[in-house]
Amino acid sequence: MSTHDPISDLITRIRNAQMRAKSKVSTPGSKMRANVLEVLKNEGYIRGYASVDHASGRSELEIELKYFDGEPVIREIERVSKPGRRVYASVKNLPRVNNGLGISVLSTPKGIMADHEARDANVGGEVLFTVF
């Protein structure tokens, strides 16, 4: 099955799995999804992820979700930039999520990174989604 928006698909799979208190969820593999998951892992929102190759040649990403006292670590995850309405931000205009308690994930010329990394690298880009 093809999706027109792989980032929204990834976010929805994570959100749905956490609502059902699943420990793992899988998603079709791609470099962009792996880079997004690397940012979420580095920021402490997921335990980790692994790439699983199938005999048919397709790969999947197996995501280990993270919980604290039985509650999901990710309270809220929202798509900002969509295929029909792209949202770009310069370094000066990067959004702060809940006064810095959450993060924005951006696609920049230097790769996919969290908002604080983009400020340090002095780059702006497309605001993919926010996590709190």
Swiss-Prot record:
One of its GO terms (biological process) is translation. Transmembrane segments: none annotated. Keywords: Ribonucleoprotein, Ribosomal protein, RNA-binding, rRNA-binding. This is Small ribosomal subunit protein uS8. One of the primary rRNA binding proteins, it binds directly to 16S rRNA central domain where it helps coordinate assembly of the platform of the 30S subunit. GO terms for cellular component: ribonucleoprotein complex; ribosome. InterPro entries: Ribosomal_uS8 (IPR000630), Ribosomal_uS8_CS (IPR047863), Ribosomal_uS8_sf (IPR035987). Part of the 30S ribosomal subunit. Contacts proteins S5 and S12. Pfam families: Ribosomal_S8. The gene is rpsH. GO terms for molecular function: rRNA binding; structural constituent of ribosome. Belongs to the universal ribosomal protein uS8 family. Disulfide bonds: none annotated. The lineage of its organism: Bacteria, Pseudomonadati, Pseudomonadota, Alphaproteobacteria, Hyphomicrobiales.
